[in-house]
Amino acid sequence: FVKSEVIAEMMRSKSSVEWGSEQPVPTGGHSAMSTLLRAARHGKLIVFSAGNYNNYNIPEAQKSLPYAFPDVLNNYLIVTNLSDENQLSVSSTSCGQTASYCVSAPGSDIYSTVGRLESNTGGAVNREAYNKGELSVNPGYGNKSGTSMAAPHVTGVAAVLMQRFPYMSADQISAVIKTTATDLGVAGIDNLFGWGRVNLRDAINGPKMFITQEDIPQEYYVPGSYSEKQFVVNIPGLGNIVEPGTSVERRCTSSECDFDSWSNDISGHGGLTKTGAGTLALLGNNTYRGDTWVKQGVLAINGSVASNVYIENSGTL
């Protein structure tokens, strides 16, 4: 069975596709794992529920795919379930070994869409009936709790941010979600809450950290991950192409594609590289340690930047 796992391939047409089923599958997990790997490598954001196996358990193997393939970690988000008191729900699996790419979200007593498998013939609901095509989903609404309620919350946040930042790639959207999360529990990334509770109010103001390996606690670091030193942002100019030559290539037609501003204070060991013909304004007091490169277009610093700033021929500060 694929139990309550939300696999969200965030399509760049500003819609989301979610699979949140409890239906049996006729084959093993290898084809599903291959599909997840392929989706992540083709620019999709994979949002996975951590599972409902109590706080002291850790996520199952499929959530740990980035340990085998660290190149997809930035396109993966694992989600735990918070109670109304911002505590990890007693039923929720903790972030555990996935903490460096895990966040938390409300998932207790959520009124939402639900679906149940029912037999078309009045028979049993089991694998054999599924294989025969005798089952269908009866949709409806109801109150549910669990990480399968928390994960769609994060999917919704990602969808809003893809509209807010139409020029960003899925891995950059993931970075914004992680770095703007409200810290819970032990300071910083921890094994229960990961980066913390997702915070859309802060996320719409841009990233709060340019992440590198140095920003991840050693006990949660996935070897080979967070290897990029620069957050490369392409403000392309109105009507120009972003992520060209990829499966998510698209024309950027929103006003943010021509001018955008980030007002959060940005920290971290990474740096910023500005590309594209448009303008990006930094409004916060930024302490990130990496270099700032203006390769194309305009970077307006209306707050402050502590790093070294370099300007190439077609760039303007």
State where each predicted segment sits.
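C-terminal subdomain of the subtilisin-like protease fold in secreted/lumenal serine endopeptidases
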Residues: 75-78, 163-241, 249-251, 255-256
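Sec/Tat-exported extracytoplasmic proteins
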Residues: 40-43, 50-53, 80-83, 95, ...
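Surface-exposed loop/turn positions within long extracellular repeat scaffolds
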Residues: 57-61, 171, 194, 265-267, ...
